[in-house]
Amino acid sequence: MSNSPKPLADTDTQSWWTKGSTSASLLGIVIFAASFTSDRFIANSLLSLPLMISTLISVLIASWGIPKLRALKMGQVIREDGPQTHQRKSGTPTMGGLLVVPVGLIIGSFVSVNGESSEQLLALSWITLAYMLIGGFDDWRSLTRGTNTGLTPRGKLLLQTAASLIFLAWAGWQHWIDSSIALPLGISIQMGFMIWPLALFVFLAESNATNLTDGLDGLASGCGALVFTGLAVQLMLRGNDGNPVLAGFCMAMAGAWLGFLMHNRNPAQVFMGDTGSLAMGAALSGVAILSNSLWPLLVMGGVFLAESLSVIIQVWVFKATKGPDGVGRRVFRMAPLHHHYEIGGTDEQMVVRRFWLSTGGLVLLGLLLRPTA
């Protein structure tokens, strides 16, 4: 009997604008329009080329790789305490990050213009691949055990911390990291030595946030593509304080996730798994740390932040109010936040579209409030 996932909605009866394919295509148009606009009006901007190449190759590689994942029986195990509608997703191939993350890294590596840029891209590629492998090991353990849990939280945290410390030691040796945090209106906060624990926290928090966001078809891949695009455009708008090479890297990663989205939109043919979501968070963090874009990442990645905070709040309140019977209060119907709306009766695709729109609005806000000299 086939493990192929069944669509959660009858796409034949849906309005054209509510179909997953249409929503994903419209998101792609927005991202391409942003890259073309940047190239047209910002000096030295070359964002469209890595975006186009990465998107095309990602679509093709995913088309080739999804049947391979299915043949290897890499079917997602759905958590039993999650929304019951998700049980129909059981068997959908996972670990899709293996197919597209390398595409973004390879295309992004071709935008280097000098030796220092090449080494920064190498460091970025290393930390992204390291997190991808950690996520892949976690996914593999889940699949072999037939459960939704792989590595222990402590084990995963230790591996992520070790990888992040190696990256930060590399960046510190090369003097790539500014000890201040750039803010709008020419304001900056001098962090001194504290920039290092902050950078480590960013890696751990951002990768966890993108991982939590990957719970609905197309949610994390769409939001990730938008945030990578926003980071790229703000790097170009910052002129001499920006970084065209890292902007090109961001667009290559945006293209990789946009191409993946064509297969990950509802009804999903493949999931990125921890393999993809942890790599996404690591790449976003690495770019932000190397380019002094922690503030733009905080604003543009607001949906990721909200997803993570919803889990923290839910757990804290439940533990703080737990009575002798072991039952505590819940702020949300279910965490992360996207499940709160889904359990409340909002259609999965509607939740995804609203989160995409929210991310798009936050990206625009981040561009308006970008750091200035």
From Swiss-Prot:
- Which segment of the chain is annotated as a signal peptide? none
What subcellular locations does the record give?
Cell inner membrane
Transmembrane stretches, start-end: 16-36, 46-66, 93-113, 120-140, 157-177, 185-205, 216-236, 242-262, 270-290, 298-318, 350-369
Q: Which GO terms describe its molecular function?
A: metal ion binding; phospho-N-acetylmuramoyl-pentapeptide-transferase activity; UDP-N-acetylmuramoyl-L-alanyl-D-glutamyl-meso-2,6-diaminopimelyl-D-alanyl-D-alanine:undecaprenyl-phosphate transferase activity
Entry protein name: Phospho-N-acetylmuramoyl-pentapeptide-transferase
Q: Which gene encodes it?
A: mraY
Tell me the superkingdom of the source.
Bacteria
Query: Which biological process annotations from GO are given for this protein?
Result: cell division; cell wall organization; peptidoglycan biosynthetic process; regulation of cell shape
Family, according to the entry, reads as follows: Belongs to the glycosyltransferase 4 family. MraY subfamily.
Give yes or no: UniProt keyword ATP-binding: no
According to its UniProt record, what is one Pfam family this protein matches?
MraY_sig1
Which Enzyme Commission numbers does its entry carry? 2.7.8.13
| Obligatory cofactor(s) | Mg(2+)
First-listed, main subcellular location of the protein, grouped into a coarse class: membrane
Q: How does it sit in the membrane?
A: Multi-pass membrane protein
Kindly state which keywords UniProt assigns to this record, in alphabetical order. Answer: Cell cycle, Cell division, Cell inner membrane, Cell membrane, Cell shape, Cell wall biogenesis/degradation, Magnesium, Membrane, Metal-binding, Peptidoglycan synthesis, Transferase, Transmembrane, Transmembrane helix
Give the organism the record lists: Prochlorococcus marinus (strain MIT 9313)
